[in-house]
């Protein structure tokens, strides 16, 4: 007997939903997208390989018609779904209710071609009630959402496939450009440029301790002789006093210490007491971006880790759909949150009517609720923690507290600001300021403070981030207070903080660039492409990012313009609502209409781009008028002054590479030396030190545009063809000072072929990687016990190692090489 077939994206979701629907339904997953634009030339059907548009996968001359292909790895699953469709009484397409989910549903419909009724089934949480309602309240496929997603996909393909090759030719291979990733990279580079321009300004202040009726409290110097004391806002980014701050007092160490001494015997009186009501309002429930921000700052989760954890919570029925830019709660959720607050914190914890929140996100468009605990009643974090892993438990706790707190009353209290004054022994009038806050009603803060392993700092309306309760003794205007001590305190302006994953997501969201579902993947891409690396939680742009952003700003400025990129999101929204047609819009973007389109922009500018100029970042000139630049080389960044070069240390951030630091690198003694001549080739054998440590090299490399020595100082010969010489890292037992020609020639035999596996024909190699010695056969790698084995292990011994079960060592053991991450820079 035929049964209804429900198709979802993931096996985990299919398993959960099948449990709710029972044996009357068949539930299967598509395992994500089943087809897409071709990833490479091999995916393009033979009959179309000769077409001029084949590399794009989009026929730009024929209405931007996309070429869709079923991925090889999805063909078995597609065949399985086709068989299930043939036996089904009806088909429910139950993919996520957003543009991407609607697109997946449409592709399923196109590929499977069901001959039975097809229904679009949507839900925002995976609970029994939600799934049963979704089966009953199905709808038709929304073709406008499909068109909008298709336009977005085509746009990103055109952008990436047209601009990325420019980067390969002018900067280095394997780079990529993208509508959102290039803007994100520009933001990181601009912030680093600001840090490089920054010059710190120093000033001194005075901290005081006062006493009254046995109670003590602190205060800071606010004014001298009626003139305000300087603070961080008084200075520009280059360390100068702002014009509007011309009248402020700027103390140095001697001035602050001297004033402290002159005030040590002074009498002080309370000059004013100002009281203001204090209100701290709860934040809205989470949407995707704010969840990523909170999980990043409170749990130290990356955006990707947050989304993967949220996905598992969603698929197992613990939270609602996690890709949304809505802060709205359904009536059911409002009731559940209020009920939970009343149960845990009493009837006085909630306001008389539910709280609603207005979305402030530019281009907000997702149709879902905010992210909240699933169900008509919320399960307490302790209950959920017994059923999920540690990451899931911590993230659920964060979501639960934020949701419940959003429906509780404000925290209220009183903020008191006191001004105290006295006269120094030389007649100077010194005024100090002290403030305190007393919380009289904790309100929503109870949801964060009670029983939490981590506390999200409550912030809101009138409260500053991280407001802490600070009590002052009862004081009135005219009261005498005792000065118990003074301490001069140094202060300095700080450069603008680098972005973290959380703050970058927030900035992109505020500008209307990207979508909730894209932020995690964008952050992953800019890191995997080498545009950024992490220093703690801070995102540090590489010099490669500087070169790429410089090229795009100079020659493709519109493509990384924040306003233009956000306007594209507006246009895609208009396509989704039917107010814009995809093909005319893509035509304007690609071919132009009054302004240059993408294709002419690339073809017209490519010849103008000077690769050497793009890959050079000036640091300045020294006292001998010699220009020092950072160059992006094939083997890493290096500094150059005249003919002298030196590698930039791998862990050096751009703002740390000052002109003085570059001079130190250039003038440092070099470990480079010639060891002798290779008898076989006649080439010089050298030992050098590069960004990944010391290595031996056979012959001098040729350098051209964008190529440079991997380490130490050297001279280029101006050749346009860059040849990469053989290089091998030194063994742990070797140093540049003690390595001999014999050692080097032995190292240069690596990687060493041991022969082929008789059973599979695969070549077996002995290699030295960044993480130690190992043998490799096909995609299988095994660590070796010692570096000496590299030179004497036989094929038979290697095959014995491969025949044993792979053992992953714990602490103190030899770590298995794991998956391949790429070529070792030396070998």
Regions found by a protein language model. Give the residues of each.
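C-terminal helical "lid" subdomain and adjoining coupling/linker elements of P-loop NTPases
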Residues: 170-174, 189-252, 298, 443
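C-terminal or mid-to-C-terminal helical accessory/interaction module adjacent to the motor/catalytic core
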Residues: 79-80, 86-87, 126-212, 275-279
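Conserved nucleotide-binding/hydrolysis micro-motifs of P-loop NTPases
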Residues: 11-14, 31-37, 97-101, 124-130, ...
């Amino acid at each position: 007997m035929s049964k209804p077939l429900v198709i979802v994206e993931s096996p985990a979701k299919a398993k959960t939903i099948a449990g709710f629907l029972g044996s009357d339904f068949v539930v299967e997953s598509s395992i994500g997208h089943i087809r897409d634009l071709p990833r490479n030339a091999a995916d393009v059907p033979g009959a179309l390989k000769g077409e001029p548009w084949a590399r794009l996968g989009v026929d730009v001359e024929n209405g931007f018609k996309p070429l869709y292909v079923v991925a090889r790895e999805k063909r078995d699953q597609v065949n399985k779904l086709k068989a299930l469709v043939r036996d089904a009484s009806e088909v429910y397409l139950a993919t996520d209710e957003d543009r991407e989910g609607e697109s997946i549903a449409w592709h399923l419909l196109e590929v499977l071609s069901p001959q039975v009724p097809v229904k679009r089934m949507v839900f925002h949480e995976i609970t029994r009630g939600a799934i049963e309602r979704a089966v009953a309240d199905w709808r038709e496929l929304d073709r406008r959402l499909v068109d909008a997603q298709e336009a977005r996909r085509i746009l990103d393909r055109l952008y990436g496939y047209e601009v990325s090759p420019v980067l390969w030719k002018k900067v280095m291979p394997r780079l990529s450009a993208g509508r959102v990733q290039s803007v994100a990279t520009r933001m990181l580079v601009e912030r680093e440029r600001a840090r490089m321009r920054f010059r710190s300004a120093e000033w001194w202040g005075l901290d005081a301790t006062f006493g009254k009726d046995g109670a003590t409290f602190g205060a800071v110097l606010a004014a001298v002789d009626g003139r305000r004391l300087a603070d961080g806002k008084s200075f520009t980014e280059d360390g100068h006093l702002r014009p509007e701050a011309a009248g402020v007092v700027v103390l140095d160490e001697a001035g602050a210490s001297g004033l402290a001494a002159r005030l040590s015997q002074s009498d002080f009186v309370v000059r004013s007491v100002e009281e203001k009501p204090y209100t701290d309002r709860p934040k809205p429930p989470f949407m995707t971006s704010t969840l990523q921000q909170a999980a990043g700052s409170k749990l130290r989760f990356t955006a990707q880790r947050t989304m993967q954890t949220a996905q598992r919570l969603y698929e197992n029925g613990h939270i609602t759909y996690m890709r949304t830019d809505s802060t709205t709660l359904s009536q059911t959720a409002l009731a559940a949150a209020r009920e939970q607050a009343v149960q845990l914190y009493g009837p006085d914890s909630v306001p008389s009517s539910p709280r609603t929140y207005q979305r402030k996100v530019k281009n907000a468009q997702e149709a879902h609720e905010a992210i909240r605990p699933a169900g008509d009643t919320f399960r307490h974090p302790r209950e959920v923690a017994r059923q999920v892993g540690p990451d899931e438990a911590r993230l659920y706790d964060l979501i639960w507290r934020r949701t419940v707190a959003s429906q509780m009353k404000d925290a209220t209290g009183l903020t008191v600001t006191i001004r105290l004054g006295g006269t120094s022994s030389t007649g100077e009038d010194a005024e100090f300021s002290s403030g305190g806050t007393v919380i009289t009603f904790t309100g929503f803060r109870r949801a964060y403070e009670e029983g939490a392993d981590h506390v999200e700092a409550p912030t809101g309306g009138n409260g500053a981030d991280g407001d802490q309760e600070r009590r002052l003794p009862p004081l009135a205007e005219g009261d005498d207070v005792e000065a118990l001590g003074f301490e001069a305190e140094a202060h300095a302006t700080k450069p603008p903080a680098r972005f973290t994953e959380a703050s970058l997501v927030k900035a992109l969201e505020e500008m209307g660039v990207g979508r909730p579902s894209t932020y995690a993947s964008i952050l992953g891409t800019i890191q995997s492409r080498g545009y950024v690396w992490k220093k703690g939680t801070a995102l540090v742009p590489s010099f490669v990012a500087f070169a790429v952003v410089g090229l795009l700003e100079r020659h493709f400025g519109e493509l990384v313009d924040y306003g233009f990129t956000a306007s594209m999101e507006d246009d895609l929204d208009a396509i989704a609502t039917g107010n814009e047609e995809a093909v005319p819009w893509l035509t304007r973007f690609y071919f132009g209409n009054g302004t240059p389109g993408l294709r002419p922009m690339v073809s017209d500018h490519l010849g103008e781009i000077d690769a050497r100029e793009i890959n050079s970042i000036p640091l300045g000139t020294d006292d001998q008028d010699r220009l020092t630049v950072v160059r992006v080389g094939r083997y890493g960044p290096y500094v150059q002054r005249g003919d002298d070069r030196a590698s930039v240390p791998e862990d050096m951030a751009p703002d740390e590479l000052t002109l003085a630091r570059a001079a130190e690198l250039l003038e440092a003694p070099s470990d480079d030396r010639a060891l002798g001549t290779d008898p076989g080739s006649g080439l010089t054998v050298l030992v050098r030190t590069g960004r990944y440590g010391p290595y031996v090299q056979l012959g001098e490399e040729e350098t051209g545009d964008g190529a440079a020595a991997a380490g130490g100082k050297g001279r280029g010969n101006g050749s346009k063809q860059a040849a990469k010489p053989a290089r091998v890292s030194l063994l742990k037992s070797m140093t540049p000072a003690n390595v001999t020609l014999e050692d080097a020639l032995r190292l240069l035999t690596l990687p060493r072929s041991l022969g082929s596996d008789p059973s599979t024909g695969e070549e077996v190699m002995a290699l030295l990687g960044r993480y130690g010695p190992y043998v490799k056969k096909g995609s299988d790698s095994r660590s070796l016990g010692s570096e000496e084995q590299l030179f004497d292990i036989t094929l038979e011994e290697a095959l014995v190692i491969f025949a044993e079960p792979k053992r992953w060592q714990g602490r103190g053991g030899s770590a298995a090489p794991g998956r391949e991450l790429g070529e070792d820079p030396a070998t």
